[in-house]
């Protein structure tokens, strides 16, 4: 398995234009809906191999990066990425620093009241342990009293805290939850023995397991679709159109199959404030 190099921490914004010039066609989204003329500016937290990561040459890679590039191409826009921690993404979207959150943001009704969301992928929560699973974590009850690392501010943190509360309700010890700026730092803490498990998503935990780094000891928890998120209803509708076209010509399935990901099976649509 190829070992991917990726950023351990990203405190500074890094803009990555993927193409030097805009495509020679008519953009499907007006400049008035965009942060930058003829450009689809997307935020990503590239610490989630194989879905989004930075390779040894410093280039953005992964399924969601490829998907964002293809959507931009079909909308006749130049893709550009800003690498940023997840906790800054929703405020940055509101401040018009980027057009689209392309980081696999989990769909929730609360978020859909703030942003236009397009569900496109099914994901779930996993827990990873150190090699050999020394704490013998086999069920969620085995997480009682354990020190667990998770990325700050996301769905994963929320679900980890809910699970900890459910353990307490059963008379078990709560988890000692430690938050980190991103998943890469959380996994580094696991490697260093600072935490006893890490919460992530199925695709990422499976990747670390396949590499032989950290066994995926629990998976498939809290299955929930992940989404694109944007301020603009017009842009969201255009993204749905691009996804529908990819679904119709088979390219969406081919991309997801290549990465072992699961396509959202319900209707592709926009959920958000009118």
Outline where the language-model segments fall.
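Extended ligand-binding regions for polar small-molecule ligands
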Residues: 22-24, 65-74, 133-134, 141-155, ...
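Alpha-to-beta junction loops
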Residues: 41, 77-78, 95-103, 146-147, ...
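Ligand-binding cleft/hinge of the Venus flytrap
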Residues: 68-75, 156-179, 209-210
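Acidic, polar ligand-binding/catalytic clefts
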Residues: 69, 73, 78-142, 213, ...
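Short helix-initiation/N-cap motifs at beta->coil->alpha
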Residues: 65, 81-91, 135, 174-188
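Periplasmic-binding protein-like
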Residues: 46, 122-129, 202-244, 262-274
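A ligand-binding cleft/hinge motif common to bilobed small-molecule-binding domains
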Residues: 88-91, 104-113, 159-166, 188-222
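Extracytoplasmic small-molecule ligand-binding "clamshell" domains
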Residues: 22-104, 249, 258
């Amino acid at each position: 398995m190829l070992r991917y190099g990726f950023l351990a921490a990203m405190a500074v914004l890094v803009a990555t234009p993927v193409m030097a010039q805009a495509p020679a066609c008519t953009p499907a989204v007006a400049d008035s809906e965009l942060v930058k003329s003829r450009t689809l500016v997307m935020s990503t937290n590239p610490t989630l191999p194989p879905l989004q990561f930075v390779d040894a040459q410093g280039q953005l890679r992964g399924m969601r990066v490829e998907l964002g590039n293809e959507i931009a191409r079909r909308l006749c826009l130049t893709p550009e990425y800003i690498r940023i921690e997840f906790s800054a993404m929703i405020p940055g979207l509101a401040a018009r620093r980027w057009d689209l959150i392309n980081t696999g943001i989990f769909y929730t009704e609360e978020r859909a009241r703030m942003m236009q969301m397009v569900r496109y992928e099914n994901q779930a929560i996993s827990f990873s342990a150190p090699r050999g699973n020394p704490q013998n974590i086999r069920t969620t009850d085995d997480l009682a009293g354990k020190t667990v690392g998770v990325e700050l501010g996301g769905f994963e943190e929320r679900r980890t805290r809910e699970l900890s509360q459910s353990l307490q309700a059963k008379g078990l010890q709560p988890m000692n939850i430690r938050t980190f700026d991103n998943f890469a730092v959380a996994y580094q803490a696991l490697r260093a023995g600072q935490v006893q498990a890490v919460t992530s998503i199925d695709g990422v935990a499976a990747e670390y397991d396949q590499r032989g780094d950290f066994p995926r000891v629990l998976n498939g928890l809290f299955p929930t679709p992940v989404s694109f998120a944007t301020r603009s209803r017009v842009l969201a509708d255009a993204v749905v159109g691009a996804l529908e076209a990819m679904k119709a010509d088979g390219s969406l399935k081919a991309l997801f199959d290549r990465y072992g990901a699961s396509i959202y099976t319900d209707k592709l649509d926009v959920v958000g404030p009118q």
